[in-house]
Amino acid sequence: MRPKQVWVSVAFEGEWNEKKPYVTESIEAGVDVIVCLPEDVERVKELGNVKVAVPLMPESPGSPDLALEELDAIDADVVIVGKGGEGDGSIDLPDDISESIDAALIEKARDRGFEVAEYVEILDKPYERFAAEIAKNVGPDYVIAIGRDWKIIPLENLIAELQGEKTQLIAGARDAEEARIAFETLEVGSDGVLLDAERIDPSEIKKTAEIAERAAAERFELVAVEVKEVKPIGKGDRVCVDTCSLMSEGEGMLVGSTSRGMFLIHSESLENPYVEPRPFRVNAGPVHAYIRVPGGKTKYLAELRPGDEVLIVDTEGRTRAAVVGRLKIERRPLMLIRAEYEGVEIQTIVQNAETIHLVREDGEPVSVVDLKPGDKVLAYVETEEGKGRHFGMEVEETIVEK
């Protein structure tokens, strides 16, 4: 599942000091896009590195080129078409999408190198149809669907229509609760939501960003695998993954020697008599091992770089993304752990040390030096045959990993 986006609009007439608190809150909450008027783009970008969208407001349907030339002079990332056009009812809807003025503007903006969003107020069924048609036939990067007076709209039809299209659906929401509904509709949900700063308290921005993060989180069905073998195997280069996040007891990362079977390696968040806890760290294993990262992908531990994202996973299989801050690669004694689940054999290699833990089936951490055949620990196992990975992406092919 791709990340859910949060957009915040401060594109209203007013003093900058009225808009600034919303922009600051948006940047601190990590929103994806801030919508503002052209004269505010520079001010927004001075406050933080954030994508900025600007409405294209031609004075008349005949002057779009002039408006686009004016936008060329500012540092906007996304152009929003539809305000003052067909999208908001200022111009009648076309009989055919090939005659659409908004569609022509989308093409012109795209030719100038902008990302493009089509703004559509869903005033009635024909406007819902127009939003779907422009997504399918013109392919803007985004369609922003807003209800009349920003009232929440039924998204089921648009979500179903846009399944498989490259255009992302951004739904208008009046608060965090409406955002949650948008993200959960038909299980898939909208790709993002747009909050209007004129209609919300700034606190709704952070709440919505948190909901978006949870909505996009992957979840794994962890199973209890039976340990078959535990043995020292000599020295090798192992990797500690130091993140920019703190982990709690019961959290770690999924790591394994094969992509179809990965053990939950516990974080160094536990008290022990040897070293101080380092709750930002997972001593993950040797350089060859796979680790789960967002988007249904894996990476080799040796491939990770500062700034990459990895998945933190808890004992219930819930996930959250964390940014890698540092990798520590050191030569250490290693241990092979081999396990089995429903006839599928999986294995991993870890540092042979008291401070490295897996997780028992009851959720309790267990040091790898205390593991023995017959013990059961938590892991993620892909039991479906015929799937392999190329460059970390799951593909249908025959690959045997031992």
Curated annotation (Swiss-Prot):
Membership in a protein family: Belongs to the archaeal-type DHQ synthase family.
The protein's name: 3-dehydroquinate synthase
GO molecular function, one term: dehydroquinate synthase activity
Enzyme class, spelled out: oxidoreductase
Keywords: Amino-acid biosynthesis, Aromatic amino acid biosynthesis, NAD, Oxidoreductase
Function field: Catalyzes the oxidative deamination and cyclization of 2-amino-3,7-dideoxy-D-threo-hept-6-ulosonic acid (ADH) to yield 3-dehydroquinate (DHQ), which is fed into the canonical shikimic pathway of aromatic amino acid biosynthesis.
Cysteine-cysteine disulfides: none
GO term, biological process aspect, one: amino acid biosynthetic process
UniProt catalytic activity: 2-amino-2,3,7-trideoxy-D-lyxo-hept-6-ulosonate + NAD(+) + H2O = 3-dehydroquinate + NH4(+) + NADH + H(+)
PANTHER family xref list: 3-DEHYDROQUINATE SYNTHASE, PTHR33563
Family annotation (HAMAP family): Arch_DHQ_synthase
EC annotation from Swiss-Prot or TrEMBL: 1.4.1.24
Keyword Oxidoreductase assigned: yes
Species the sequence originates in: Methanopyrus kandleri (strain AV19 / DSM 6324 / JCM 9639 / NBRC 100938)
Gene: aroB'
Domain of life: Archaea
